[in-house]
């Protein structure tokens, strides 16, 4: 908490903010001005920032004469100054309020700030190329760079080599035990757990060795057409386990999908799954389960699908994963 009334105060406040380890900033305008120093604070702060402002509290007892406490015009001037400086800041739809209202605005800013910070510290690791004819999974990397997201594109062959190099890894038995405990009655193919554990360790080691200076990682991986025949399994279960660890994994080298999953994870503080618009709803299902219960026509509905990255937390039966 600091009062900024001059450019010198701004520098001092910025140092205090850095010492405190803050990675997001809310600039609260308690009265009109000073727009230059307050917007300079936002300019020089390296992280997500928002602006809110005080509203008048009462007209009684000279509240609008000697008791002014409003920053309505100050917010207007500050927003103009931010634009002049090309400073991007979050301003709520109605950014002026009393203490409780401003606190609510700050609370609403938290997931936004988390998403911005996380994207600034994200690397997407892909293993491709995407399957033939899956043009929907095309992902020009320019837009990732525009979001300050790093990407490392790898060959599926590189991943296969790393997987083979992890054969007999001493950590495999412990991972198998963890999988057995997690799957319970859903452990329908115990004979492949060793390979799945080997693959999970391969990915985690790859992340550790390749994340570089980035704090977070998401993966866009491949699961077909040659994956199953060459690796000897499908990776869905491992992908779901990584997703539960906070490392979202998308299929079909869907890089933008991995980015979407990552944002969802950060904003929700929870594991996410990616649901594709896949196919139409059959007339009989519509008649039995939707018509009369919801205000939708058949043409308003669709079936969503994804091929297995939903973690066990969100399945009714382990066999569904």
Locate each region found by the language model:
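Conserved thiamine diphosphate
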Residues: 77-95
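Conserved small/polar residues in nucleotide/adenosyl-binding loops
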Residues: 314-321
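Long, internal scaffold/assembly segments composed of regular secondary structure
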Residues: 184-258, 264-267
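Metallocofactor- and cofactor-centric catalytic cores in central/energy metabolism, strongly enriched
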Residues: 1-66, 71-76, 93-108, 113, ...
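A glycine-rich phosphate-binding loop feature that marks nucleotide/adenosyl-phosphate handling sites
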Residues: 218-225, 276-291
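Catalytic phosphate/nucleotide-handling subdomain of diverse soluble enzymes
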Residues: 255, 259-262, 267-286
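Conserved anion/nucleotide-ligand pocket segment
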Residues: 111-138, 289-307
């Amino acid at each position: 908490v600091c009062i900024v009334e001059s450019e010198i105060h701004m520098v001092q406040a910025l140092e205090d903010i850095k010492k405190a380890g803050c990675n997001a900033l809310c600039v609260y305008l308690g009265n009109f001005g000073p727009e230059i120093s307050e917007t300079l604070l936002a300019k020089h702060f390296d992280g997500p920032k928002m602006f809110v402002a005080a509203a008048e509290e009462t007209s009684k007892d000279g509240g609008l004469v000697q008791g002014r406490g409003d920053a309505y015009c100050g917010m207007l001037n500050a927003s103009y100054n931010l634009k002049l400086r090309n400073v991007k800041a979050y301003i709520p739809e109605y950014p002026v309020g009393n203490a409780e209202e401003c606190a609510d605005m700050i609370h609403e800013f938290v997931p936004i700030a988390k998403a911005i910070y996380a994207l600034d510290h994200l690397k997407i690791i892909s293993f491709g190329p995407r399957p033939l004819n899956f043009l929907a999974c095309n992902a020009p990397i320019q837009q990732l760079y525009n979001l300050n997201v790093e990407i490392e594109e790898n060959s599926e062959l590189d991943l296969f080599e790393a997987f083979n190099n992890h054969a007999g890894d001493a950590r495999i038995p412990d991972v198998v035990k963890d999988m057995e405990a997690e799957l319970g009655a859903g452990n329908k193919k115990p004979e492949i757990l060793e390979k799945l554990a080997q693959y999970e360790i391969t990915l985690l080691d790859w992340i550790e060795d390749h994340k570089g200076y980035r704090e977070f990682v998401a993966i866009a991986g491949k699961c077909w057409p040659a994956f199953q025949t060459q690796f000897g399994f499908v990776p869905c279960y491992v992908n779901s386990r990584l997703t539960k660890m906070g490392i979202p994994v998308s299929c079909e080298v869907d890089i933008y999908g991995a980015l979407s999953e990552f944002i969802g994870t950060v904003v929700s503080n929870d594991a996410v799954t990616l649901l594709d618009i896949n196919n139409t709803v059959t007339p009989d299902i519509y008649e039995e389960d939707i018509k009369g219960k919801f205000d939708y026509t058949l043409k308003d509905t669709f079936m969503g699908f994804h091929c297995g990255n939903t973690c066990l937390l969100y399945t009714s039966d382990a066999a569904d994963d």
